């Protein structure tokens, strides 16, 4: 299954989550496309809630269904912790997620493009694989030749705060994952247990 490239504002409204990270999609019309007001939304089944929660997380991180499901299965093999929490941690360990969290990009989509185009390094070596798994202690940086790129500079300057599980050096334009994130540091509006139920239901 290919990555969705259609109108993200429409998907944001349907799922009730801002995929751009700005919240603009929901500021004018918080109800789903096709509805004519917040009070008209139809009741949703248990399966529908599970599917919607899965789609919210998948679209937020911009993964294909195959990538998303593969990472979910990988999380299920981790013995310590819960399946859902481990899944969310693995999503945060993706290189494109760290690039976004460090503030090199204003959106995860932009972060993925920076990685794909070879602007990002891990421990001094260029890595152009967005799904690369970053482990605590590894240093993520911008290539010297890319440090003056306007979108990167603008993104770094716009950051108000970074999560506590990363460190950042503004002068060197580099940072690291100092530790794995705690569940409470991640999206509070998402119920990952519903995603576990969704895939368990499929068998």
From Swiss-Prot:
GO terms (molecular function) for this protein are: rRNA binding; structural constituent of ribosome
Which residues are in the S4 RNA-binding domain?
Answer: 93-153
One GO cellular component term noted in the UniProt record for this chain: small ribosomal subunit
What SMART domains does its record include? Answer: Ribosomal_S4, S4
**InterPro entries linked:** Ribosomal_uS4, Ribosomal_uS4_bac-type, Ribosomal_uS4_CS, Ribosomal_uS4_N, S4_RNA-bd, S4_RNA-bd_sf
Q: Which domain of life is it from?
A: Bacteria
Quaternary structure annotation from Swiss-Prot or TrEMBL: Part of the 30S ribosomal subunit. Contacts protein S5. The interaction surface between S4 and S5 is involved in control of translational fidelity.
The entry assigns this protein to a family as follows: Belongs to the universal ribosomal protein uS4 family.
What the protein does? Answer: One of the primary rRNA binding proteins, it binds directly to 16S rRNA where it nucleates assembly of the body of the 30S subunit.
Q: What is this protein called?
A: Small ribosomal subunit protein uS4
The encoding gene: rpsD
């Amino acid at each position: 299954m290919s990555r969705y490239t259609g109108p993200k504002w429409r998907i944001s409204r349907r799922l009730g989550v801002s995929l751009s990270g700005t919240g603009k999609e929901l500021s004018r019309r918080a109800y789903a496309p096709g509805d004519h007001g917040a009070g008209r939304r139809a009741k949703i089944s248990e399966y529908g809630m599970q599917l919607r929660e899965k789609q919210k997380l998948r679209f937020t991180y911009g993964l294909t269904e195959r990538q998303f499901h593969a990472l979910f299965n990988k999380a299920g093999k981790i013995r310590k912790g819960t399946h859902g929490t481990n899944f969310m941690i693995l999503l945060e360990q993706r290189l494109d997620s760290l690039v976004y969290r460090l503030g090199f990009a204003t959106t995860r989509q932009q972060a993925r493009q920076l990685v794909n185009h070879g602007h990002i390094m891990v421990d001094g070596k260029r890595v152009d694989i967005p799904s690369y798994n970053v482990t605590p202690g590894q240093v993520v940086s911008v290539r010297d030749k890319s440090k003056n790129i306007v979108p990167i500079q603008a993104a770094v300057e716009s950051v108000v705060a970074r999560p506590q599980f990363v460190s950042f050096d503004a002068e060197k334009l580099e940072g690291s994952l100092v530790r794995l994130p705690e569940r409470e540091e991640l999206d509070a509006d998402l119920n990952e247990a519903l995603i576990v139920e969704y895939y368990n239901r499929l068998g």
